[in-house]
Amino acid sequence: MAESQSPRWGWALTGSGHFFTECLDLIRGLSGVDLFVSRAAAEVVRMYRNKFELPQGARIFRDTTASAAPVGLFYERVYHTLVLAPATSNTVAKCVCGISDNLATNVFAQAGKCRVPSIVFACDTAPELETMAPGGVVKVHPRRIDLENTQRLSGFEATHVVLSLAELESAIADRRQLLGHG
């Protein structure tokens, strides 16, 4: 990376539709952001296509290669922070078990190996949640294993697990303040 370029935000999207549009709003408020879109996230993006406006200069990396080639950018110190949001219970479980078989889980693994701090917004975090589905609001009941995996992930090095949109907003604001920029 050229010395004149500032490190960027990395933001990984998973297949969760829960808080998806709110996360897009947060992404639009950042400068210097790259999106990592897993295959499952690409399906969700298609549903929200009309709301998928990004800030100027944002780059999008899609899950198109077996080796998830864009993860090499973490070794080049291109990123100061990774945000994994919204994170499905499947993504959280894979992160906890060290499985990096898609773009989102791979960038999380590489961020950890490169000591890039991560903020993870785990969506399945309460015994009962309400979420918006194509047919309207539905109640979701995360399994005990989902709640346990979220707890386990919160013990990972350089990983800040947030449990609500307000906590995600606060974690991003804190990180921005620490970095002194966007």
What name fits each language-model region?
Residues 1-182:
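A cross-family phosphate/adenosyl-ligand binding-site feature
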